[in-house]
């Protein structure tokens, strides 16, 4: 259970193998401060990436972001304006949910 109203989950894959899972959380992190996140709290993308074993960094990685509301309905989970630049550098493909399903970030 994620103790937040907006529940974001980030999954990192390499060749269809799940390598890391992250969630938005109240925990602070120095990298979150460097990126400029409000209150220095980690977004799900950063949480997943920091948990990714170092041996996989630099490989072709896919990020999948999912968000759901309290009724477990899919909602918009596109990376925010602070996450997008570094995610585009790190991931070869980025997918996210919206109210209608899943989309690929272009």
Where are these regions (language model features)?
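Short, basic/aromatic recognition patches
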Residues: 1-8
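Generic short beta-strand
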Residues: 8-11, 94
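Zn2+-dependent cytidine deaminase-like catalytic core
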Residues: 20-106
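Short, glycine-anchored, charge-dense loop/turn motifs used at functional sites
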Residues: 13-19
């Amino acid at each position: 259970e994620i103790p937040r109203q907006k529940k974001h989950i980030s999954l990192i894959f390499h060749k269809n193998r799940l390598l890391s899972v992250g969630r938005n959380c109240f925990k602070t992190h120095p990298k979150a401060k460097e990126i400029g996140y409000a209150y220095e709290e980690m977004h799900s993308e950063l949480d997943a990436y920091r948990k990714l074993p170092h041996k996989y960094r630099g490989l072709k990685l896919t990020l999948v972001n999912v968000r759901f509301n309290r009724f477990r309905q899919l909602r918009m989970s596109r990376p925010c304006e602070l996450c997008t630049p570094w995610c585009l550098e790190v991931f070869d493909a980025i997918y996210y949910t919206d109210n209608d399903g899943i989309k690929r970030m272009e």
